[in-house]
């Protein structure tokens, strides 16, 4: 009897799912539940076309005249970084094996990318974010809350599941943060991780370069302060960087005839557009920070709260403690990007929720968030409010407010600027989301639009995607009639309930566990009880 009594806890502990895995599974289900099942931007379509061109042996040349650069021989290439097209290739290859029509294969590829590839990349970014916080000495619970704050309490959530490249850039920043956090603990093998993060970011978007320059400067400063790593570690880090940059320059030369020609120059020259418009700098810089249209702090108010807390109540901890270099870096990277983007012709990033080009930067605020959640009592309430706010960003397509904006201006209903709240997502989303929920429950699908049908913005807003919840089960119900609307809502609700249960269980296990594993590796073993790893 005694032996059986002792055996039972041991067996249950072996069957226990590590809380980190539960948390990450909750993130994945959240991103899947709120995905539309398709792309919400033309950028993603161009990247898919590039991946398809590779598989067809055309070397990346595509037929679209929009947002492409034309070479002297008449071919057209996307001028975006190639990495997101690379990660689309497996889904596209699987879809091409299906015994269905070509159009169905294309839709299947989009479905796989938005429900599998994109959510997994976002979860991976958050996993390394959590690992970085643990290496910085933040407790499991505070690390978990900070990771939830980044993943669901900022504009990251919107871009984590819509097909844009922001989550892939965020993965690069997260890898860098993880590597540097290891290096701050005198672990020289953090440097290759940091180098890999920079490679991921620059291979995804050329405009990540200003951020990476600041991050590289901090990395070098830390190396000078801590002492240089061994030659083999430096060699591996340098090889990753050199190989990536060399590959990108070679791909540029193949596409556009010169290693330093990314395609942006050709595109702007062809369209006779100015790349930078410095005379608009002041207004657009302010708009990027606090405007209803694209204000970084209005679309992620939790980050505004943590900065107020840091400067008013916790300067010594945040800016003079062990994580001070990373906290200062987050502010520097934000400032550099605002200066750079505010003069850029397409500073607003096109369709999207808030300032798209700043979405990946929220990863860098994770250390500051971790410190806050360890020290304040109001953190849980602020986190709940932030998540509720961001839920509005995933109820409707990313293009919703832009269509509403164009429709209002074209009909003369109003004049829209960056400071007109009535033309912005932050003011339009609550009412439009509530209307979409009512229509979904009542079975009012709105107008069905034929594939590739061209309509005015005010007519597009009457379609099912904008009149009902933009979640893939609901879209399958209203657009393809594959299930009853209540079955679709039950499926979505089940995913939400599973998400809540998984995340609740993760934090429950952390609360019941023995003292946190100090400086744990980014591994599931770090979450097992002492003696089990």
Feature names for model-found ranges:
Residues 1-531:
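Membrane-proximal envelope and lipid/glycan-remodeling enzymes
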């Amino acid at each position: 009897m005694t032996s059986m009594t002792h055996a039972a806890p041991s067996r249950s502990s072996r069957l226990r799912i590590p809380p980190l895995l539960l948390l990450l599974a909750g993130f994945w289900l959240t991103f899947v539940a709120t995905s539309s099942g398709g792309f919400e931007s033309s950028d993603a379509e161009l990247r898919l076309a590039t991946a398809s061109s590779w598989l067809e042996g055309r070397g990346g040349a595509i037929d679209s005249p929009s947002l492409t650069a034309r070479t002297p021989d008449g071919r057209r290439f996307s001028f975006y970084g190639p990495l997101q097209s690379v990660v689309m290739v497996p889904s596209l290859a699987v879809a091409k094996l299906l015994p269905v029509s070509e159009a169905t294969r294309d839709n299947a590829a989009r479905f796989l990318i938005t429900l599998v590839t994109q959510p997994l990349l976002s979860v991976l970014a958050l996993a390394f974010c959590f690992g970085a916080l643990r290496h910085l000495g933040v407790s499991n619970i505070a690390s978990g809350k900070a990771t939830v704050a980044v993943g669901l309490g900022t504009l990251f959530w919107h871009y984590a599941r819509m097909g844009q490249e922001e989550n892939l850039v965020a993965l690069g920043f997260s890898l860098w943060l993880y590597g540097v956090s290891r290096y701050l603990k005198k672990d020289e093998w953090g440097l290759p991780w940091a180098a890999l993060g920079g490679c991921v970011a620059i291979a995804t978007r050329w405009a990540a370069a200003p951020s990476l320059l600041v991050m590289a400067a901090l990395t070098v400063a830390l190396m000078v302060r801590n002492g240089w790593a061994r030659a083999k570690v430096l060699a591996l880090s340098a090889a990753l960087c050199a190989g990536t940059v060399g590959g990108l320059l070679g791909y540029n030369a193949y596409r556009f005839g010169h290693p330093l020609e990314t395609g942006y120059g050709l595109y702007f020259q062809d369209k006779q557009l100015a790349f930078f418009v410095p005379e608009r700098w002041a207004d657009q810089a302010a708009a990027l920070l606090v405007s209803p249209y694209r204000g970084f702090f209005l679309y992620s108010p939790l980050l505004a709260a943590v900065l107020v807390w840091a400067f008013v109540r916790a300067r010594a901890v945040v800016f003079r403690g062990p994580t001070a270099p990373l906290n200062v870096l987050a502010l520097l990277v934000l400032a550099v990007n605002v200066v750079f983007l505010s003069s850029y012709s397409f500073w607003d990033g096109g369709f999207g929720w808030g300032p798209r080009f700043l979405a990946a930067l929220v990863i860098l605020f994770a250390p500051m968030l971790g410190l806050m959640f360890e020290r304040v009592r109001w953190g849980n309430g602020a986190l709940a409010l932030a998540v509720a706010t961001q839920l509005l960003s995933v109820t409707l397509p990313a293009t919703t407010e832009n269509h509403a904006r164009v429709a209002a201006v074209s009909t003369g209903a109003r004049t829209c600027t960056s400071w007109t709240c009535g033309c912005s997502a932050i003011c339009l989303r609550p009412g439009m989301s509530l209307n979409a929920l009512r229509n979904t429950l009542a079975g009012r699908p709105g107008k069905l639009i034929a594939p590739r049908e061209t309509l005015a913005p005010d007519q597009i807003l009457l379609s099912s995607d904008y009149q009902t919840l933009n979640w893939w089960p609901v879209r399958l119900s209203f657009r393809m009639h594959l299930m009853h609307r209540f079955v679709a809502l039950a499926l979505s609700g089940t995913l939400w309930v599973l998400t809540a249960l998984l995340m609740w269980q993760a934090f429950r296990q952390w609360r019941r566990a023995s003292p946190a594993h100090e400086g744990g590796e980014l591994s599931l073993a770090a979450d097992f009880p002492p003696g089990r790893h």
